[in-house]
Amino acid sequence: ENFAGGCTPGYQRTADGRCKPTF
């Protein structure tokens, strides 16, 4: 279940390769 690159559910991967919340 790789949402946006292995981020926690509810998080999205940014161009930096980090994960930030999208809620």
Swiss-Prot record:
It comes from the Eukaryota. It holds the Pfam family GBP_PSP. One of its GO terms (molecular function) is cytokine activity. One of its GO terms (cellular component) is extracellular space. Keywords: Cytokine, Disulfide bond. Disulfide bonds join 7-19. Hemolymph. Causes rapid, rigid paralysis when injected into Lepidopteran larvae. The physiological role may be to reduce hemolymph loss following injury and promote wound healing. Belongs to the GBP/PSP1/paralytic peptide family. This is Paralytic peptide 2. It comes from Spodoptera exigua. The lineage of its organism: Eukaryota, Metazoa, Ecdysozoa, Arthropoda, Hexapoda.
